[in-house]
Amino acid sequence: MSAQSLTHDARRILLAQALRALAYGFGSVLLGVTLDERGYSSTEAGLIIAAVLAGTVLASMAVGRYADRLGRRRCYAILYVVLAGVGVAFAASHTVWLLIAFALTGALSTEVVESGPFTSLEQSMLATELSGDARVRGYGAYNAVASAAGSLGALAAGGLSLLHDAWSGAPADGWFFLVFVPVALAGAAVGRSLTDHVEAAPEVRRRREPAQRLGPSRGVIVRLSGLFALDSFGGGFVVQAFIAFWLANRFGASLGTIGVVFFAVGVLQTASFLVAPRLAERFGLLPTMVFTHLPSNLLLAAIAFAPNLATAVALLLARTLLSQMDVPTRQAYVMALVTPAERTPAAAYTNTARYVVRPIGPVLAGAAQSVALGLPFLIAGSIKSVYDLILWRWFSRVEIPSEDATPPPPAPAARGAR
């Protein structure tokens, strides 16, 4: 999907997303290394990262309930302003509970692609741009932009080690969270430049009752939400900030090395997002989701046994090449399974299900590290593999309706379930 085929608002949204992903890619490296540099324990680091994820849940729920009435553009710009404040707090404060409080605002994210309340708003605002056969390609481009910008941010963070080598008086790494301030303010300006076309319909803005409930596709979405929650729970053990922390702690990897690794991760993610639509067109959405995701999770589990940094990085990069192909296909799959009237609540249900369980992972990962430093990788890979197998078992026979067809019947129950 070329930029010329997008509307003015869609291009602006992708620009704002790119700015945010640049900051998140920079921060994902910086956060893990800074937590290690400041001497926080594994438990304290896990609590801070968990607070970031919990804030994602709370802010996403608030956006889902109030953004259409308060104004999507207004909420979008406010989130960017809050992100600027978070940058100041993480640069200036070493107090664990203060960092947790700012993390709970939901403006910070440990991921560059699916980043909580921002993503929820963007999916709503881009919905009119993504329809029919172009949907999966559109989502692929949307995620690729974030991944590419995030990889550049990670590379920039890696360059800080060169700065310290060249300048003995360079400030501590944590102070570079101030980079969030100009980036976030630029994102806010872009958000405010969007037109009224991205807002909800006037009748939606005037109403007082909650958003429409799911209709005939309720059974399908409830099952998918549960499965997506399981996958997200497993992913919470190995968020990017944790991986940076683990590489630094386990192998003594420098900030520069980690930055280069995450840049390579971002490049492979971008390629993955762009290849996924082509695979989906040939093999189908669900086969692409499952049969790229499952091998990636086996590689993830294998990282726990890496004897050295080179092996760990090789496994991580191989896993990354496959692991993100399910993202645009998953987004398109959910939208294809429901009626047009159900798309907004379906997105809200499935996104919230992913976000709400994710904060548990970093806390448990911190505890698991006390048993074995690489144990979170083994746990994550196992949980996410179970998700793939159940997803295929439950949905491999569920047909995707055409745009004009009625919604699918509820997915078959698991064997033995009543």
Whereabouts are the PLM-identified features?
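Helix-loop boundary and gating motifs at the non-cytosolic
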Residues: A3-A54, V220-F228, S232-F263
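Hydrophobic core of transmembrane alpha-helices in multi-pass small-molecule transporters
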Residues: A18, V86, V96-P117, T311-M325
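Transmembrane alpha-helix termini and helix-breaking/packing motifs in multi-pass membrane transporters
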Residues: G32-V33, E37, S151-A172, F176, ...
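Central cavity-lining transmembrane alpha-helices of secondary-active solute carriers
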Residues: L47-R65, F263-V275
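Helix-to-loop junctions at the C-terminal end of transmembrane segments
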Residues: A59-G71, S161, S272-L285, Q369
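Structural signature of the two symmetry-related core transmembrane helices
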Residues: R74-A89, P287-A302
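Intracellular juxtamembrane helix-capping segments at the cytosolic ends
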Residues: L108-L130, M325-V338
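C-terminal membrane-cytosol helix-exit motif in multi-pass small-molecule transporters
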Residues: A157, S161, V181-P202, Y387-F395
